[in-house]
Amino acid sequence: MASINDNYLKLKAGYLFPEIARRVNAFTTANPNAQVIKLGIGDVTEPLPLACRQAMAKAIDDMGDRQTFKGYGPEQGYAWLREKIAQHDFQARGCEVNAEEIFISDGSKCDTGNILDIFGKDNTIAVTDPVYPVYVDTNVMAGHTGDANEKGEYGGLVYLPISAENDFVAAIPSKKVDLIYLCFPNNPTGATATKAYLKQWVDYALAHGSIIFFDAAYEAFITDPTLPHSIYEIEGARDCAIEFRSFSKNAGFTGTRCALTVVPKTLTAKAADGSDVELWKLWNRRQSTKFNGVSYIIQRGAEAVYSPEGQAQVQELIAFYLENARIIREKLAAAGLQVYGGINAPYVWVKTPHGLSSWDFFDKLLHTVNVVGTPGSGFGAAGEGYFRISAFNSRANVEEAMERITSTLKLG
């Protein structure tokens, strides 16, 4: 009889966001007239930038003409998009990243999981707590962990607690770890990292032969000019870091799917025989074998992000969501809640009132004021007692949600 990958049986009952959807669906089925406002999952609501829509429409026309039709594209992405990314997102900030080191994909969520294909199972892996659940769950699926304990922590992972006491930035570990997941601006806490802080991680990784997985999915929301947007703004990072980015949140591509991963050609890791192996070659081989590339139409839309019109329209989108975050942060703070994030990030991290658990606060908001957020405990044991509220919604919905919460619930 065929056997399964038993590692899937180690996973907790359900991925966080499907569990939220299950509870919301049960509530709306029982209360069909309820006007539920969803500020939970970080999905965008505003239309794609006009420049992107126009570029994709033209690309569709290209597909209708034998002279401009495109079949299979390069698995790594079209050179014209990779070059625009290298120029605008990296070289313009002083980062030594060239187009060949950029791999276009259909999502950074996929890439942060798939990157494990090129690493061995004997690596010690460090994640922050709380953390984006995909980092943990994909390692469980890949057989890199033991079972979960009563708090949901998996054996074999090194958890780095982040809290208000350390400004939601993890301390550098005292022992050696091999693979390190960092996300800034942070999901879920909205915390940001300074260059000095990232330099500590780069120095640590270089000293220990570690690799940093740097998730910069929300870098476009940074408005503070002193904060780094890329790990490659830090000297030495090319020799110890892989960076993941996405068009989902800055340009609204959650439904059209386009992202990128940067693997520097100078980056190496050890083979079983002790030799150094270029990770770029392994990732290129992996993508060439398991991935057929992002559609031509979508890549043309992503390319339009870098046009003058696209840049202006993307900045309007970012400013819109950041204003939503400001409204959420200030309204909840004025109502007496402890709030964090929401300044250079689209997420507001909230301390639950009156000692409520994360899921109890979720249920209270859903059933009392018909507002959905994300329980902090879903991001890890250290997230218990916190709650994430997303700025990704319409202005009217954000204002209505804040009015409901602050006027109906006693929060202070």
Swiss-Prot record:
Residues binding pyridoxal 5'-phosphate, per UniProt: 72, 108-109, 132, 187, 218, 246-248, 257, 292
List its EC numbers: 2.6.1.83
Please give the pathway this protein is involved in. Amino-acid biosynthesis; L-lysine biosynthesis via DAP pathway; LL-2,6-diaminopimelate from (S)-tetrahydrodipicolinate (aminotransferase route): step 1/1
Entry cofactors: pyridoxal 5'-phosphate
Q: Does the keyword section mention Transferase? A: yes
Q: What reaction does this enzyme carry out catalytically?
A: (2S,6S)-2,6-diaminopimelate + 2-oxoglutarate = (S)-2,3,4,5-tetrahydrodipicolinate + L-glutamate + H2O + H(+)
Positions carrying N6-(pyridoxal phosphate)lysine: 249
What are the record keywords, sorted? Aminotransferase, Pyridoxal phosphate, Transferase
**GO MF term (any one):** L,L-diaminopimelate aminotransferase activity
In terms of SUPFAM superfamilies, this protein maps to: PLP-dependent transferases
Amino-acid positions noted as binding substrate in the UniProt annotation, renumbered to this chain: 15, 42, 109, 132, 187, 292, 388
Q: Name one Pfam family in it.
A: Aminotran_1_2
Q: Does the keyword Transcription apply?
A: no
Q: Name one GO biological process term.
A: lysine biosynthetic process via diaminopimelate, diaminopimelate-aminotransferase pathway
Describe the protein's quaternary organization and the partners it interacts with. Answer: Homodimer.
**Protein family:** Belongs to the class-I pyridoxal-phosphate-dependent aminotransferase family. LL-diaminopimelate aminotransferase subfamily.
Matching entries from HAMAP family are given as: DapL_aminotrans_1
Per its database record, what is this protein's job? Involved in the synthesis of meso-diaminopimelate (m-DAP or DL-DAP), required for both lysine and peptidoglycan biosynthesis. Catalyzes the direct conversion of tetrahydrodipicolinate to LL-diaminopimelate.
Q: Write the protein's name.
A: LL-diaminopimelate aminotransferase
Q: Which organism is it from?
A: Synechocystis sp. (strain ATCC 27184 / PCC 6803 / Kazusa)
Q: Which gene encodes it?
A: dapL
